[in-house]
Every structure is written in structure tokens, then in C-alpha cells.
Amino acid sequence: MITGEEINQCITDNYPELIDKIYPIFTTVVNDLSVVYSITTVSGGYVGQDILQLRIFDSDYDVATEWKRKLINLFSTEKENKAIVLPTVSFTGALSGGGDNFRDDLQIWEITAIFVLKTKERV
């Protein structure tokens, strides 16, 4: 099972410009880029599976879709056939879905990417 802290660490280690722009479940920041994550555990144990949903919010569609591309490249590991190794967990990931939505109430784009992560606890 992967935690939000590990997702945050993985993203900020690779993209330090996202430090303080990553939030669990929701964000109240609508005047700047923000990335919101949610994790659903499908199966647990020593080897498990999680669904990671990333939502990128920005008023500029091109900026949001560029960040989506970067995060897809980070979490879709099947192309290189390698795992991402963190101190307490390692995982492989595959893009499972996503989409684009314009939030008319906030005048901001919400770009979503959904990943299936196969996790293994590190002892």
C-alpha cells in the first residue's frame, strides 16, 4: 500500500517546482497550479495494488496538459519495465484513464490521470 507522503515525495523528488503545490483529496488554490491526489487501495498486503488519481488544476490548459504529460511519464513505468523505488515501498505503474474538464464555476481546467500501481513493501 502506498501513502500520500510517498506520492508527494516521488513527485517532488522528480519535479521540485511542485513543492507546496501537491494536496490530498482537494485544493482551495485556484489562482495557481495545483496537483491533487487520491489513493484507493484495491488489494493490500506485502504485494498490493492501488489506484492513484491525479488531478491537475490550472487556468492555462496548455500548462495543465504539460504537467499531465510529465506525471504520466513519471508514473507509467511499463515502457521502461522498471520499478520506482522509495524507502518503504517500490511500485510499477500503468496509465488507466483520465480526462479533461473545464470548471466553469472556478474558471479553471481540471485535467485527470488515473494510474494502477502495483506495490511491494520494502522491509
Range-by-range predicted roles:
Residues 50-56:
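Short, well-ordered beta-strand segments in beta-rich or mixed alpha/beta enzyme
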